[in-house]
């Protein structure tokens, strides 16, 4: 029996999980992969990838001023610009802490639109969703939290993160390393982490504890989870990815369930 059937015991009405290998193939799945789910902050992975395309196209640069005084695109992508979680209030000086911010990502979308004249949702559609044939995916509002997609589409995206075709391998490799090292901060739902490592929009597992991935996941594991009860992780060392979507908001149930589930998913494919 598949490890993935554990999701049937979670307190959600609907759930789906898919595992993708280094060849981009789905090697395990459970649940309706065609059902559309709100992604919440997993949206940031789609947005981050869109920003990487924009960087390669030189529509924007990491050095472009954006956000509060002294901040750049680089700071906003790495959650070090100083913004509050969901408002323009400034919580700390630029580059001194890791302050996870929806507002910061929304400022990135504004900057991209100002530089290109193209709405973020349209840029994502043209740059990422259409090339990957993600026909049931959209960003319908905030680029930080208003994405909608299916497990089938996100499996295609996970395959892209394992074997990039839209951006250069080096671009993705650079985006999924730690930027602005040794910064402490709060990982929502899991408390203060020191360091609270992040790449360019991608959360990096590093040495964080507690965490939503498994204890055996390599430090290089990257991804994101969302308040709507969703997550996507990529383990570049073992060439493996997992997409899991539910319709139960994140809470203590997820803190209790996700890490052991992800540990078993990893072990089932690497033992």
Regions found by a protein language model. Name each.
Residues 46-49, 103-110, 152-156:
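Well-ordered alpha-helical segments within folded domains of soluble proteins
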Residues 6, 49-53:
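Residue-level detector of alpha-helical secondary structure
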Residues 1-38, 96-97, 113-118, 122-126, ...:
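Catalytic loop of the DD-peptidase/beta-lactamase superfamily, centered on the K-T-G motif
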Residues 38-42, 46, 54-91, 100-103, ...:
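Active-site helix/loop module of the DD-peptidase/beta-lactamase fold
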């Amino acid at each position: 029996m598949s490890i993935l059937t554990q999701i049937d015991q979670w307190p959600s009405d609907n759930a789906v999980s898919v595992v993708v290998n280094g060849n981009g193939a789905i090697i395990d799945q459970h649940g309706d992969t065609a059902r559309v789910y709100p992604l919440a902050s997993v949206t940031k992975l789609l947005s981050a990838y869109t920003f990487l395309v924009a960087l390669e196209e030189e529509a924007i640069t990491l050095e472009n001023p954006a956000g509060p005084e002294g901040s750049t695109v680089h700071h906003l992508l790495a959650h070090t610009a100083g913004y509050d979680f969901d408002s323009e209030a400034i919580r700390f000086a630029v580059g001194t802490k890791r302050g996870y911010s929806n507002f910061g990502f929304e400022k990135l979308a504004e900057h991209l639109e100002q530089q290109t004249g193209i709405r973020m949702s349209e840029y994502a559609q043209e740059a990422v969703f259409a090339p990957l044939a993600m026909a049931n995916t959209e960003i319908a509002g905030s680029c930080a939290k208003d994405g909608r997609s299916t497990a089938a589409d996100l499996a295609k995206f996970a395959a892209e993160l394992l074997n990039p075709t839209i951006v250069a391998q080096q671009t993705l490799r650079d985006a999924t390393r730690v930027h602005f090292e040794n910064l402490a901060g709060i990982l929502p739902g899991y408390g203060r982490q020191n360091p609270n490592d992040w790449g360019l929009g991608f959360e990096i597992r590093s040495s964080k504890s507690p965490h939503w991935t498994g204890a055996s996941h390599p430090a290089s594991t990257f991804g994101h989870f969302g308040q709507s009860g969703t997550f996507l992780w990529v383990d570049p060392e073992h060439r493996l990815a997992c997409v899991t979507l539910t319709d139960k908001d994140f809470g203590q149930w997820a803190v209790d369930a996700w890490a052991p589930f992800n540990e078993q998913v990893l072990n089932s494919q690497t033992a």
